Amino acid sequence: MTDSKYPGLLERFIKYAKVETRSDDQSKTVPSSPKETAFLKQLAAELTELGLENVRIHPQNSYLLATIPANIDRPVPVMGLLAHVDTADFNAENVNPQVVEDYDGQSDIPLGDSGYKLTIDEFPSLKKYAGQTLVTTDGTTLLGADDKAGVAEIITLAAYLKEHPEIKHGQIQIGLGPDEEIGTGADHFDVKDFGADFAYTIDGGPLGELEDETFNAAQAEIDIQGKDVHTGTAKDTMVNAIQVGIDLQNQLPVHDRPEKTADREGFYHLYKFDGTVDHARLVYLIRDHDKKLFEARKEALRAIVRDLNANLGEDRISLNLYDQYYNLKDALKGHEDVVELAKKAMEDLGIKPDIYPVRGGTDGSTISYLGLPTPNLFAGGENMHSRFEYVSVQTMEKAVDVLLKMIALNAEE
């Protein structure tokens, strides 16, 4: 296997990727899947073996917590490093990573025997990785670089610091959490117990990503109660719940969809629609960077439901609308130095920081609103949440480089 400047990094990542930890948005437990619990226990044993202190799984939020003690004789702000262990809502059984060494930057990459390929035409980002080692899927599952790349990078950092005591640093807190992909992982994060002054999630994408702004996010769950009667006698009697759902969807702006928007444009995303004539259920994601536009989107959906119920003559449509997280940038006001530290670390290493409003969210969004400023750093993954996911080993190495540089800068007088 490819030699790495950080021994064990690639091996760790592949080992972690093979463990199924898909979170379950229908579960009411924490973590949502027992497989996450098993993996967290596996990682706890690894951190204990590396000599980290106070290794434990938090009894309420199931975060795996650990401390790298300071080796410097003066006060230094405590840095936190966070990642999540669950993977997204895509097949994660029997993940079989493929290692492509010295990729030429121009060829298509077959994904095992699945018949799928990573093609230059469809994924031009591949051109950036000429001469690098890529880890891909075999075409049947996702890879899980989101966020097991981040997990591997943090644990590799811990191992490297153990082997290099000459690197002076303050106390570092590590937190590896569940259920980020279903939006609940950080809901019960205990900032006081974690004990950091500032933190970073290592959960971003390609080299240089530094995210200090996210969407505001809400979810809308809509249930429609129809009335099913024989089609031969349906006139003025039948209420087709499926058709009501279609009518509702058609009242939303056609261009306010993920596939029609970019940059700071918000959207409504209908990502589940199940139904019969008798009952239908629609689930929407509502997203916008601008708080006022976010609130307006929610009110527009409420108004559509009210109008449809009025037209039906009775309340056949119920709406459960709730916020999921808020724009990270608002919570980071007054803590710009946390972003600047990461930016300077990248610049000192010759990496161009790529700072832009991310079209998504991170656990750092929630954690920042709980009082711990937590921007997001790149972990390396491309095409996440899909069979076309891949990651560059060299980008993962540079993620560790950046963490080491940040630690050094934080320890400077």
Curated annotation (Swiss-Prot):
Q: Which domain of life is it from?
A: Bacteria
Biological process (GO) annotations held by this record are: peptide catabolic process; proteolysis
Primary location class:
cytoplasm
Q: Keywords on this record? A: Aminopeptidase, Cytoplasm, Hydrolase, Metal-binding, Metalloprotease, Protease, Zinc
Catalytic residues at D86, E180 (proton acceptor)
The protein's GO terms of the molecular function aspect are: metallopeptidase activity; tripeptide aminopeptidase activity; zinc ion binding
Function recorded in the entry: Cleaves the N-terminal amino acid of tripeptides.
Its family remark reads:
Belongs to the peptidase M20B family.
Q: What is this protein called?
A: Peptidase T
